[in-house]
């Protein structure tokens, strides 16, 4: 039994973990870098009012990573005859806030410990939408690495290739002090929507 559990855990560490998301989202996916699969999730209770709906800073490195991820996605889409997604500053801020929230509170999910879904977070940020989707990832150190991982995953790729979206925003957060409860260093969120 322990050997089988260790083998299963090793397989999880060696591959990309994918989980779908429902609720009002059309699609959502999770991606964890190989070697960074979480053993457990800390669910710190905090008030919804404390949810970080905006970034504490516009660090140039963070902005550069987010812009590069959007460039990679739009270059890919245009090369396949799809529309380039409008890079929305409001979606970027919401995506970055979710990445920061995951890093600060040791969870990795589309749904926050407070029970907020991607659509809930966008509504709290006064972002209107007809349809919304989300990709998240953890452990990938560069925009190219997370883009490559998402492209290798059918669910993530489906979000990136969907002609249903008109706007997108990519958000990145760095956890400079990962712990056993929150072992990831790099957190990524990309929100997609149609208005």
Give a label for each model feature.
Residues 33-36, 40, 92-141, 160-162:
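Short, surface-exposed glycine/acidic/tryptophan-bearing loops
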Residues 26-37, 42, 138, 142-195:
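Disulfide-stabilized extracellular recognition modules
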Residues 17-20:
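C-terminal motif of bacterial Sec signal peptides marking the signal peptidase cleavage site
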Residues 84, 135, 191:
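Conserved beta-strand positions that form and line the central face of beta-propeller blades
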Residues 23:
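Short, conserved catalytic or interaction motifs in soluble domains
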Residues 29-63:
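Post-signal peptide N-terminal segment of mature Sec-exported envelope proteins
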Residues 61-119, 166-168, 173, 177:
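Short, well-ordered surface patches within globular domains
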Residues 1-10:
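Bacterial N-terminal signal peptides that target proteins for export
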């Amino acid at each position: 039994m322990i050997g089988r559990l260790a083998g299963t855990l090793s397989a999880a560490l060696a591959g990309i973990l994918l989980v779908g998301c429902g609720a009002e989202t059309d699609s959502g996916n999770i991606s964890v870098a190989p070697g960074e699969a979480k053993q457990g999730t800390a669910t710190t209770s905090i008030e919804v009012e404390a949810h970080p709906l905006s970034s504490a800073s516009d660090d140039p490195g963070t902005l550069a990573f987010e812009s590069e991820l959007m460039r990679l996605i739009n270059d890919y889409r245009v090369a396949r005859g799809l529309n380039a997604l409008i890079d929305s500053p409001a979606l970027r801020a919401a995506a970055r806030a979710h990445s920061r929230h995951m890093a600060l509170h040791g969870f990795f999910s589309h749904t926050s410990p407070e029970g907020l879904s991607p659509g809930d977070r966008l509504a709290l940020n006064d972002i209107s939408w007809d349809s919304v989707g989300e990709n998240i990832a953890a452990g990938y150190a560069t925009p190219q690495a997370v883009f490559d991982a998402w492209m290798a995953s059918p669910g993530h790729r489906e979000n990136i290739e969907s002609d249903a979206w008109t706007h997108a925003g990519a958000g990145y957060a760095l956890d400079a002090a990962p712990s056993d409860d929150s072992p990831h260093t790099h957190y990524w969120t990309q929100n997609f929507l149609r208005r």
